[in-house]
Amino acid sequence: MELNGKTALVTGGSQGLGEQLCRDLAAAGMHVIVNCVRSAARAETIAKETGGRALVFDISDSGAVQSAFEQIETLDVLINNARVDPYKRPAEMEDAAWFDRVFGVNLKGPYLCSFAAAEKMKGRGGKIVNISSVWAYRAANRRMLEYAMSKAALHTLTRSLAKQLAPGITVNAVAPGMIESKEIQERLTPQEQEALRKSIPLARAGTAREISNAVRFLLENDYVTGEILNINGGTQFV
């Protein structure tokens, strides 16, 4: 797909990897719709700086998704990037409620948005890219359990939609490993960060730009679908 002049929706586009994706796609000539649910002011800023627009809605709410997509005239690309951070579980939240929140955003959101996007892409073609994680392949500890489960299920959604929506729409995923981010700096001591980097065969964390480049490859290549592109420095061979 030639990106220039096309329209992309990036969920969770107001920070981190989502912001990087918005800025890089805009630089490639795309009109970018910046989605978020809580950081409306930040989304508006990014949209203004990239010549796009902000669209605030909860991707886990079917009614909100339907209403939001009614406001989108044409759509060529959907990046399902929004996620629930496994380190931000409220202490008082019960297991069942946390499960629902994680799966609501990490799986139900991409499910709802992908089908809504597919309707917009009928007859014109399009690209869907899901942002997964290396945790999809791992036996998770208690903190990461729901997150890992949701990302593994996202792989099933990716491959299933790739078959269902072909030939006009390709559906792929990118599964990052450790990525340099503000969250990593906040959660881990310098010693812990260094230990993690040393455990990676390439001896460093990845960058948001490297993940964004992988997404762009999947958007520009018209003969790849149903694939999980692993960007993890050799941490996990699949």
Give each language-model segment a name.
Residues V105-G123, A162-K163, P167, R216, ...:
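Amphipathic alpha-helical dimer-interface segment in Rossmann-like NAD(P)H-dependent oxidoreductases
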Residues A40, V56-S67, A96:
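The beta1-alpha1 cofactor-binding region of Rossmann-like NAD(H)/NADP(H)-dependent oxidoreductases
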Residues S14-Q15:
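Conserved glycine-rich cofactor-binding loop
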Residues R204-I231, Q236:
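C-terminal substrate-recognition "lid" of short-chain dehydrogenase/reductases
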Residues V84, D95-L112, V129, L154, ...:
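Catalytic Tyr-X3-Lys loop
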Residues K127-A153, T158-A166, M178-I179:
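Catalytic loop of short-chain dehydrogenase/reductase
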Residues R89-A91, D95-F103, I184-Q185, E192, ...:
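Substrate-binding pocket helix/loop in short-chain dehydrogenase/reductase
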Residues H155, L165-I179, V224-I231:
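Conserved Rossmann-fold SDR core element
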